[in-house]
Amino acid sequence: MIIAHQSGPEPCAIIAAMHVDLLRLALGLYFVGFAHSVLTALNKKQTMFRPALAAVSAGFVLHVASIVLRAMDVRYLPLTQRYEAFSFFGALAALGFLIAYAKYRIAPLSVFAFPLIFIMTFVANLFYDPSPAIPDVLRSNWLYIHTPLIFLGYAALFIAFAAATMYLIQEHALKSKHPVRFYNWLPSLEICDDLAYKSLAIGFPLITLGIMTGALWAQAVWGVWARDAKVLFSFLTWLVYLLLIFYRLIAGWRGRKAAYLSIVGFIGVLVTFLGTNYFGGPHTFQ
């Protein structure tokens, strides 16, 4: 008598299921951080920060594990699909916050960071593709250099944006005759400005190197720079940050002016990352 053995799930299928489950668990933990941000904004005072910090920290660990399993599943750096890009951005935003918090202990930064982390990860879940087809042009070692540099730069510039926003809120509160209670929780103007500047000092070189490696990649593939919306907006955003660096170092800009320009720069980052996807071109996420 022949006994038929039922084969179990394929290893790739198990890995794919695990990485999705881990990402959803991370999303659930990030929601605790998101709830903290909403409650703090509504109550105008710190609400459940420590549980939110623990949840987001645990979520980040699960998120990284999910990205590693995704890479094992698809066998390339998972940054070419919308699902992968949003997931990676969310993870790096979490990393940026955790590093900034470890150095500065600025709890109010969470009010700005946690919503972005949650939203990016939530959107990633909406675009999940179990069997992506990577274009041949992306099967290049440049993918492992150009794209992480850009995303790391984006994460650092997000922290600069959050610090600049805190600066403006704190400045307004100090001048107000009836400041809200939340202002007492904010760091000093000097700390906000210092965090914004140091984050800019990290983010600007990263996106500069990212743009340079992207140009070299385009030269190797097409012989010219790719002419698409993302290239244009990346360059315009880079110019904004170049002006910010210039005015800080040469003209001595500090405080409000630098904060406003930092916010304008990050709006450019969001337009580059989100908006230009609808214009087509080599950088369009599938």
Show where each model-derived region lies.
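Low-complexity, intrinsically disordered or signal/transmembrane-proximal segments
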Residues: H5-Q6
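Hydrophobic cores of alpha-helical transmembrane segments in multi-pass integral membrane proteins
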Residues: H19-A133, I145-A173, L189-V221, R227-Q286
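Active-site-proximal inter-transmembrane loops
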Residues: I134-W142
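Juxtamembrane inter-helical linkers in multi-pass membrane proteins
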Residues: L174-E190
